[in-house]
Amino acid sequence: MKRSLLFSAVLCAASLTSVHAAQPITEPEFASDIVDRYADHIFYGSGATGMALVVIDGNQRVFRSYGETRPGNNVRPQLDSVVRIASLTKLMTSEMLVKLLDQGTVKLNDPLSKYAPPGARVPTYNGTPITLVNLATHTSALPREQPGGAAHRPVFVWPTREQRWKYLSTAKLKAAPGSQAAYSNLAFDLLADALANASGKPYTQLFEEQITRPLGMKDTTYTPSPDQCRRLMVAERGASPCNNTLAAIGSGGVYSTPGDMMRWMQQYLSSDFYQRSNQADRMQTLIYQRAQFTKVIGMDVPGKADALGLGWVYMAPKEGRPGIIQKTGGGGGFITYMAMIPQKNIGAFVVVTRSPLTRFKNMSDGINDLVTELSGNKPLVIPAS
C-alpha cells in the first residue's frame, strides 16, 4: 500500500510541468535492502546459534535467516522451521480475550473468581479483586512464577492447571491489583484457564477455532507432532525437550514457525493485499500509562515501557525513534521479539537460538533501529538548483 501510494505521488508530481519546474525525487529503498543492512549486525551482535527474521513493510515481505537450525548441522532456518515463540504466546492469549469480549462471553472487568473452577479460591487485596484486565496487563499483583518449581526442569511444563489453582487457594497478594505492574507468567496461564471456562470449551479448541485455523497457521500448536519436533530448532545453550506445553497454555507454550508468525503479524498491518483486522485496534489498545503505577517490575527489557496494553508494551517516541509497540519472549533456548509501528504498516518478528554469548538487548536494539529506519523510508524531494 505504501509503495503504491508513493508511486502515485511520483506520477502526480511528474505531471505538474506547465507551471513549475519538475522537482527531482529520490525513490525510497526497498525494504529488503534495509533489512539486509541490519540483519547481519542483529545476528552477530546477539551471539545466536541460529536466527530467523520476518519483516513486513506495507506490500513488502522479507525473510532472512542465519546460522544453523541445530549446532553443527550447517542448515539455515527456513520459513517452516519450528520455534518456540515463548512469551509472545501472551499476545495470542490477549487476542483470545478480545475475541471473547467481542462475542459478549466475558468483560474486561470481570473478576477472575467468576471463571474459577468449582470450589477454588482467588485472593483479593483488602477486597479489591483480580480482574481479567489485570491478568492481561501484568497488574494482578501475582508473582512472575509460581513458587516451588523443580530446578532444571524442561520449560513450559509446570505448573499444570491443577497445580496453579491449588497454589492460588493459599496465595496472598502484596499489593492491590492495578496499583503496580509486575511481569507475571502465572497471570496469563490463569487468564487462558478463565477464557476456557467462560466459553465452555477446552482452550486448545478455542485456539484452533479462533486463531490458528482462520489464519492458516498449520504449524502453530502446543502439542507438536513427530514431524514438527524434527523441524524444531535446537539451541547450543538452554535447549529443552520437544514436549507438549499445555501447562503454559497462556504464558509461553506456543510452538510456531517464521511463516506462521508472518501470517499472524499481518493481521495488524494493512497493504494492497491485506486489511488490518477490525479487531486489531482493540487488541493493541493501551490500558495503563506508566505514571499510573507505584512500581514497574520486569517490563523494560527492550526499552522503557511507557504504557501497557493487553499483552503488548508501548515505548513512546524518543530521540528520533517513533513509538513502537512490542513484546519480548524467551525460554527453552530461544529468545523472541516482535516490534511494530502499526500506523506505518511496519512489523518485525525475530527468533534466535541461544549460545553462551547470546545477548537479548543487542537483538532488540537492532530490531528497534530497523523498524525505525523503515518508518522513515519515504521519497525525498530535492530542491531544483
Curated annotation (Swiss-Prot):
Write down the Pfam families for this protein, in alphabetical order.
Beta-lactamase
Signal peptide location: 1-21
Please provide the Gene Ontology terms (biological process) for this protein. cell wall organization; peptidoglycan catabolic process; proteolysis; regulation of cell shape
Q: Where in the cell is it found?
A: Cell inner membrane
Superkingdom field: Bacteria
Can you cite an annotated GO cellular component? plasma membrane
A GO molecular function assigned to this protein is: carboxypeptidase activity
Main subcellular location: membrane
Assigned EC number: 3.4.-.-
> Which keywords does UniProt give here?
Carboxypeptidase, Cell inner membrane, Cell membrane, Cell shape, Cell wall biogenesis/degradation, Hydrolase, Membrane, Protease, Signal
- Is this entry keyworded Protease? yes
- Activity modulation comment: Inhibited by cefmetazole.
Give the phenotype of cells or organisms lacking this gene.
Answer: Disruption is viable and exhibits no overt growth defects, but produces morphologically aberrant cells, particularly in cell filaments induced by aztreonam.
Q: In which family does this protein belong, per the annotation?
A: Belongs to the beta-lactamase family.
- What does it do? Hydrolyzes the cross-linked dimers tetrapentapeptide (D45) and tetratetrapeptide (D44). Removes the terminal D-alanine from muropeptides and disaccharide pentapeptide M5 with a C-terminal D-Ala-D-Ala dipeptide. Associated with recycling and remodeling of peptidoglycan (PG). Also displays a low beta-lactamase activity.
Q: What is this protein called?
A: D-alanyl-D-alanine-carboxypeptidase/endopeptidase AmpH
What lineage does UniProt assign to this protein's organism? Bacteria, Pseudomonadati, Pseudomonadota, Gammaproteobacteria, Enterobacterales
Originating gene:
ampH
